[in-house]
Amino acid sequence: VIRATDDEDAMRIANDSRYGLGGGIFTKDEDKAVRLARDHFDTGMVRINSFGAADPNMPFGGVKDSGYGREHGGFGMKEFVNAKAIFLPS
């Protein structure tokens, strides 16, 4: 656990890595944590006020040098589906 001085410092610490599989935020303000995770955290997964194993119902995967793509959950199933575009003249 690394203590940050403010939100900007927390995001600098969290994103200062070439990897981006997952991270976590521990705080009493869960609404703020959700905003930070959604808008500023550069990882594929973020846990708020917890750490643990991956949930098979949630997408699992990272960004940056941790790779791209997702496993598990609905997003994981899309890795095994080929989308086809079919065009009709209007």
Residue map of PLM features:
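Conserved C-terminal structural/oligomerization subdomain of aldehyde/semialdehyde dehydrogenase
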Residues: V1-S90
